[in-house]
């Protein structure tokens, strides 16, 4: 297949070509071979200097001032502040330096970024029937993902002009340029290769009419190697394919008292190698095709745990019971029940620490800028006590189908206990690290998963509908980690932050006592009394904060539908999330004054007595009190319920078939990220996208099968 799309910025485009083929051969009565190949080639192109939100001017400013004009009434591109103030630019202009103004729209097409991507996946399966009831499989999978990129910043781009001007010296009225004229070329070459090998033996044997045994045992080895290389050139000339040399060892005086600087090499290299080895067994014994006993076991090892075998290997197992209720004699009269199955499992699973190792990892990063000697940085400190997180699960399930498959359902109730919970824990800052992944405690979780699917017909039409519903609640029952500063728990539940007796991703806030009716100051509570001592309020103990709940939705799911009539069909899906909280953004006056970082809540601020009855946004105060800002920013006024219902996607299609041939196809038009149809908050906010809304994607396409 082939598809072409446009990006989210002007001039951006991408192409993708996909190929997939599957083949099978039977070599005699017992031996067969299957293989699959998948190839994806893609290309992307963007103007890398295209201004994006938020536009950060620099120089301590984190946002562009409101109502900034990028184009005048006659269509001319206008400049905005970028790193330097106007008086500094006037001086540079008087000294004859290059134009140092930043015009975002003029700079848009001065720099380009191109990338070429390829993804190849091969899978081979050698299948051999040892005996009629005993089969063996040897499976090999190879994956290769590579990308090449080229980023070119033109000589007249702001990036290059900025560097040329900064490295310009004025000597006796003459300009000396230490940075070369020309473009900056950056190349990237990334490759990922993985190999997966599996040997598996399966058994399917009946003993008489009442006993059946299904089992498989196997081992799997997986390796993945990631290699990343980047290079670049200064003073690049695309017409003659030349570049200019620069001195990376010299420390230069920058123009206008901007300090000192050195030219950074554009070459970098990195790579990772990971290996995992697994052994597994699955078995099911059935009696009279009604009662079942299952057992599974698995043992995994990973090279991230060094050479200690006991740390590498993590044994996992589960056992289960199965009862086909619909096959019992007392159910024979219930013809409307297709099947009814009860099941239960108990076992242990595991979670490997992602990116955390029990050995010290260092990375060699080149030569030091002053001594020119090679040096290395500690990528992660030693963590010898690190273990897998173990999860014990007890599950009860019910599966059913009624009225010839018109209604199919699955219901699961589970209880989980996590041991050796993995979490980033506050660490001794004198070590150079503020957080370290540790095993910090235990979590108890219980929940319900429900799936219902229906199939109905009406005349020439049909309606297929399914709903997935999940409820999950967790609580930290044991915590051996470090309780950090109060400020660490005020991010609105964006980080894990386990606490005894609380859910994961907890949402805390300062208790608000409303606004002062006299001057609009925010107020809190100190020792049970209304207070405006912001320094004390901002450092209040965690136990006196409001605990709202979790930022992770306890209730979530989706409703998927396909309605067809004749050759036309309509697909749509709704997503829902209930029971969670999030922290909304609001005005922070210090950021407004110092960094031009404003917010629409500025219009809702307290301005006169009586406003405290209709707003929670404090009055503007200058000079600003940073502790006052901090208290309001993290107060309960900015904690909002996150319940929502969203139309995720919708598609209208037409299916066709060419008579007297095997050619079939579809034409369709659809949209993704359609939008919210209900939210619980009154702020008109989308809890999933607090900055920019998710882009709505419109697609038109088709496919043909020969």
Language-model segment annotations:
Residues 40-94, 149-171, 224-249, 340-366, ...:
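A surface-exposed, glycine/aromatic-enriched loop/edge motif typical of exported proteins
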């Amino acid at each position: 297949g082939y598809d072409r799309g446009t990006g989210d910025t002007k001039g951006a485009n991408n192409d993708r070509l996909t190929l997939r083929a599957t083949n099978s051969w039977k070599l005699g009565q017992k031996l067969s071979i299957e293989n699959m190949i998948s190839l994806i080639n893609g290309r992307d192109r963007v103007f890398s200097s295209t201004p994006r939100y938020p536009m950060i001017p620099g120089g301590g400013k984190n946002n562009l001032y409101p109502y900034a004009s990028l184009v005048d009434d006659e269509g001319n591109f206008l400049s905005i502040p970028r790193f330097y103030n106007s008086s500094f630019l006037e001086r540079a202009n008087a000294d004859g330096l290059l134009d140092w103004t930043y015009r975002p729209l003029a700079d848009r097409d001065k720099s380009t970024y191109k990338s070429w991507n390829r993804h190849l996946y091969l899978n081979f399966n050698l299948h051999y029937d040892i005996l009629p009831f005993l089969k063996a499989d040897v499976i090999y999978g190879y994956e290769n993902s590579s990308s090449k990129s080229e980023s070119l910043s033109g000589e007249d781009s702001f990036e290059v002009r900025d560097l040329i001007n900064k490295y310009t010296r004025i000597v006796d009225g003459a300009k000396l340029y230490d940075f070369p004229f020309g473009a900056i070329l950056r190349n990237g070459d990334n490759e990922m290769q993985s190999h997966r090998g599996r040997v598996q033996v399966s058994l399917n044997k009946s003993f008489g009419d009442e006993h059946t045994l299904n089992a498989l045992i196997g081992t799997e080895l997986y390796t993945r190697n990631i290699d990343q290389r980047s290079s670049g050139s200064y003073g690049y000339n695309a017409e003659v394919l030349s570049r200019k040399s620069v001195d990376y060892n010299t420390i230069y005086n920058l123009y206008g008292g901007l300090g000192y600087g050195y030219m950074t090499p554009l070459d970098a290299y990195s790579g990772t190698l990971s290996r995992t080895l697994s052994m597994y067994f699955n078995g099911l014994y059935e009696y009279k095709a009604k009662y079942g006993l299952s057992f599974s076991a698995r043992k995994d090892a990973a090279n991230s745990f060094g050479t200690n075998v006991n740390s590498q290997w993590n044994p996992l197992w589960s056992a289960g019971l199965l009862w086909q209720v619909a096959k019992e004699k007392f159910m024979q009269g219930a013809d409307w029940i297709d099947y009814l199955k009860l099941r239960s499992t108990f076992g242990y699973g595991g979670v490997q620490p992602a990116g955390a190792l029990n050995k010290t990892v260092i990375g060699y990063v080149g030569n030091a800028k002053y001594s020119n000697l090679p040096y290395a940085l500690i990528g992660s400190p030693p963590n010898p006590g690190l273990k897998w997180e173990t999860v014990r699960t007890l599950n009860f399930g019910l599966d059913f189908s009624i009225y010839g498959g018109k209604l199919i359902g699955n219901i699961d109730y589970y209880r989980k206990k996590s041991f050796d919970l993995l979490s980033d824990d506050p660490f001794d800052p004198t070590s150079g690290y503020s957080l370290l992944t540790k095993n910090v405690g235990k979590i108890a979780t219980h929940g319900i998963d429900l799936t219902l699917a229906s199939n109905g017909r009406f005349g020439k039409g049909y309606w297929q509908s399914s709903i997935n519903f999940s409820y999950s609640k967790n609580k930290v029952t044991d915590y051996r980690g470090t309780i950090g500063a109060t400020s660490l728990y005020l991010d609105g539940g964006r980080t894990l932050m386990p606490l005894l007796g609380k859910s994961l991703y907890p949402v805390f806030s300062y208790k608000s006592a409303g606004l002062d009716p006299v001057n609009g100051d925010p107020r809190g509570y100190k020792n049970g009394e209304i207070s405006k001592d912001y320094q004390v309020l901002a450092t209040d103990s965690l136990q006196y904060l409001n605990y709202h709940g979790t930022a992770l939705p306890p209730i979530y799911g989706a409703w998927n539908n396909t309605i067809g009539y004749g050759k036309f069909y309509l697909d749509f899906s709704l997503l829902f999330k209930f029971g969670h909280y999030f922290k909304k953004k609001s005005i922070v006056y210090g950021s407004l004054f110092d960094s031009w970082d404003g917010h629409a809540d500025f219009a809702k601020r307290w301005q006169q007595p009586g406003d405290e009855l209709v707003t929670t946004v404090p009055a503007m105060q200058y000079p600003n009190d940073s502790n006052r800002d901090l208290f309001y920013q993290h107060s309960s006024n900015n904690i909002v319920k996150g319940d929502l219902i969203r139309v995720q996607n919708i598609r209208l299609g037409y299916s066709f078939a060419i008579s007297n041939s095997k050619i079939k196809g579809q034409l369709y038009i659809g949209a993704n990220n359609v939008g919210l149809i209900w939210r619980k908050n009154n702020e008109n906010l989308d809890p999933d996208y607090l900055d920019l809304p998710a882009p709505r994607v419109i697609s038109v396409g088709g496919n043909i099968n020969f």
